[in-house]
Amino acid sequence: MKKARMTVDKDYKIAEIDKRIYGSFVEHLGRAVYDGLYQPGNSKSDEDGFRKDVIELVKELNVPIIRYPGGNFVSNYFWEDGVGPVEDRPRRLDLAWKSIEPNQVGINEFAKWCKKVNAEIMMAVNLGTRGISDACNLLEYCNHPGGSKYSDMRIKHGVKEPHNIKVWCLGNEMDGPWQVGHKTMDEYGRIAEETARAMKMIDPSIELVACGSSSKDMPTFPQWEATVLDYAYDYVDYISLHQYYGNKENDTADFLAKSDDLDDFIRSVIATCDYIKAKKRSKKDIYLSFDEWNVWYHSNNEDANIMQNEPWRIAPPLLEDIYTFEDALLVGLMLITLMKHADRIKIACLAQLINVIAPIVTERNGGAAWRQTIFYPFMHASKYGRGIVLQPVINSPLHDTSKHEDVTDIESVAIYNEEKEEVTIFAVNRNIHEDIVLVSDVRGMKDYRLLEHIVLEHQDLKIRNSVNGEEVYPKNSDKSSFDDGILTSMLRRASWNVIRIGK
């Protein structure tokens, strides 16, 4: 049997993980909000109309921050439509998803829901069809204590205390030709700079995210990032990254190698940020907000059909990917990659959270809620991936795929929780044919013992969970042993593993 070797030491530190790396995203899109988290009149809902079972599932994921309300949706969103008496709120055409937005949920309702799931809001402003003044008005409404037009409007709407939203996105995917109000890199750089400057006059404590490229495949990448930061470097704190992967070619081995592409993308953005830092002779670092990432491809044809042939509906079933086991493996691999860059990635948002390319699904028209395959790697990472990222030294067997060379069989990272005196090793065996023995030298962890080895595996890489039951769920494994500082773990072919040691 093949072997991989890894050395883990508490002195080999990358950075402490910012808990916001386990964030998510709720957009007014499809059934994410309506017929998702918000279903008034449903027996499963609370007095505010929010699904209690969905709230409990979100709590299982322990999501600390949620991006809202978009996404492409935000570029034609009028936030004023979603505040005040519900009966007075207008219905609007959502140009991004060819849907009807009823505005029954707005910033105040969403803030109330976020408190129920113990998350803070990451608010996006409309820089597509609107601009500086509207962004400032929204910030004033949300964060100013009172005594001004928009803060008093919030108080009149029954919300006395400000929401105190800390993180704000300056638009969404403004490099994309599909975006309402799409801009060139110079146009966006200027409006991002001026909007950021004005917003920080109102509330200097906020953190601002400038739009980076919609994916590494955009023709303007990475010149977009360089140009935008050339304008806005002094006023923003983060640059955003978005990336989705799919397996339309039905090539699993190559699909699982795409986390290597993710790593290249991240390194390129860091290099671009640091080039502008050097150019400006700045002492300030720009951090990364990877605020859209996931697997997304299953529903593409169905989505195109709905938007073309059945437009202008409330909560149409859009982007409802039902995930396979191999999708869960890539989500795990992407999480490992994000953790390895914890020194620069401070925020990340699994896109999305409920029904729309999501770990949580509610059946249509008020049916049961259930966990997708991708729920579990994210849950494990959010639960056990808190602490200091250690730099693992790995010697792994390699394989080639149709589009990638020298792909490591084993991808792994270790997290040291100093407070609990625990180390968690996350490892994916992305060899789809062979089991691999991972031998980890952890001799620096004196008096530690094996706590557990959790595994996510299935013989059928295309298997899915459903409302009728979970085919893919975590199990305890007896395939690890710990002796004299050497942790030996048998990693089944195509498996996600969480191996925990502690005192």
UniProtKB/Swiss-Prot annotation:
Reactions catalysed according to its record: Hydrolysis of terminal non-reducing alpha-L-arabinofuranoside residues in alpha-L-arabinosides
pH-linked activity: Optimum pH is 6.0.
Catalytic site positions: E173 (proton donor/acceptor), E292 (nucleophile)
InterPro entries registered for this protein in UniProt: Alpha-L-AF_C (IPR010720), Glyco_hydro_b (IPR013780), Glycoside_hydrolase_SF (IPR017853)
Enzyme Commission number, as recorded: 3.2.1.55
GO BP terms, alphabetized: arabinan catabolic process; L-arabinose metabolic process
Record-level GO cellular component terms: cytoplasm
Pathway: Glycan metabolism; L-arabinan degradation
Site (Important for substrate recognition): W296, Q352
One GO molecular-function entry: alpha-L-arabinofuranosidase activity
Top EC group: hydrolase
Top-level lineage group: Bacteria
Thermal activity profile: Optimum temperature is 60 degrees Celsius.
Family matches, as SMART domains: Alpha-L-AF_C
Annotated SUPFAM superfamilies: (Trans)glycosidases, Glycosyl hydrolase domain
Amino-acid positions noted as binding alpha-L-arabinofuranose in the UniProt annotation, renumbered to this chain: E27, N72, N172, Y244, E292, Q352
Major subcellular site: cytoplasm
Keywords recorded for this protein, A-Z: Carbohydrate metabolism, Cytoplasm, Glycosidase, Hydrolase
Cell compartment(s), UniProt: Cytoplasm
Function (record text): Involved in the degradation of arabinan and is a key enzyme in the complete degradation of the plant cell wall. Catalyzes the cleavage of terminal alpha-(1->5)-arabinofuranosyl bonds in small oligosaccharides as alpha-(1->5)-linked arabinobiose/arabinotriose, but does not display significant activity against linear non-substituted arabinan. It is also highly efficient in the cleavage of alpha-(1->3)-linked arabinoside of xylobiose and of the alpha-(1->3)-linked arabinoside decorations of polymeric wheat arabinoxylan. It exhibits very low activity against sugar beet arabinan.
Family statement: Belongs to the glycosyl hydrolase 51 family.
Subunit description: Homohexamer; trimer of dimers.
Protein name in the entry: Intracellular exo-alpha-(1->5)-L-arabinofuranosidase
